Amino acid sequence: MKAITLLSSGLDSVAALAIAAEDFDIEMAITFDYGQRAREREIEYSRKVCEYFGIEHRVIKLDWLSEITSTSLVNRDVEVPSLSFEDIGEAAPAEITDASAKAVWVPNRNGVMLNIAGSFAESRECEYLVVGFNGEEAGTFPDNSLDYVKAMDRAFFYSTQNGVKILAPLIELGKTEIVRRALEAKAPLEYSWSCYRGEEIPCGECESCVRRARAFKNAGVKDPLLERLGI
């Protein structure tokens, strides 16, 4: 079976690609440039991941999406929230992660990306779109949830002739389990980039960095990216 993967170079999308590649023929990876702060890192690292797997890499620019996005993920005049392990713990007030999610929200981003990727999948007669949606982020980002996957599958039933479906191998997993499964699948995590800020090295403070750090700590392994960068 053939698939196209959405690849941001983040921990989740790289893990999902590696897991899917065990059973599917991955035709192409698509990375989106919507003006996000980390776009240069994401594109660079996604290219390296695609070289590792020997698959085609396509970058699609969405300039209009950056124009209508005012949050910190795109707008450098708005500060990206800094969090700690305590802020993302089970005992932490939901207001903290809700505020962080709102600060990096991009209007209908996943919906836009999935529909574009769905067009490519249909045109190439691919049955599946691989995504890194996961159980941990679904709590604060509803467009990472199983309900969302089911809704998009239903939409693709009507909007694609071949009934493209979403393959979300991480949909029930937390970040720690994702790290373990990614390592089992020999995912090139040394070329996975999670930081929202997109500087030369990960900031270690944004929500994405903190969730990643906690996952590797709980998994009892060193982060291959930080090892490669000498951090």
Swiss-Prot record:
Binding site for Zn(2+): 195, 203, 206, 209
EC number of the protein: 6.3.4.20
Top-rank taxon, per record: Archaea
Keywords: ATP-binding, Ligase, Metal-binding, Nucleotide-binding, Zinc
Annotated binding of ATP, by residue: 7-17
Top EC class of this enzyme: ligase
GO MF: ATP binding; ligase activity, forming carbon-nitrogen bonds; zinc ion binding
Cofactor notes: Binds 1 zinc ion per subunit.
Family per record: Belongs to the QueC family.
Role this protein plays: Catalyzes the ATP-dependent conversion of 7-carboxy-7-deazaguanine (CDG) to 7-cyano-7-deazaguanine (preQ(0)).
Protein name listed in UniProt: 7-cyano-7-deazaguanine synthase
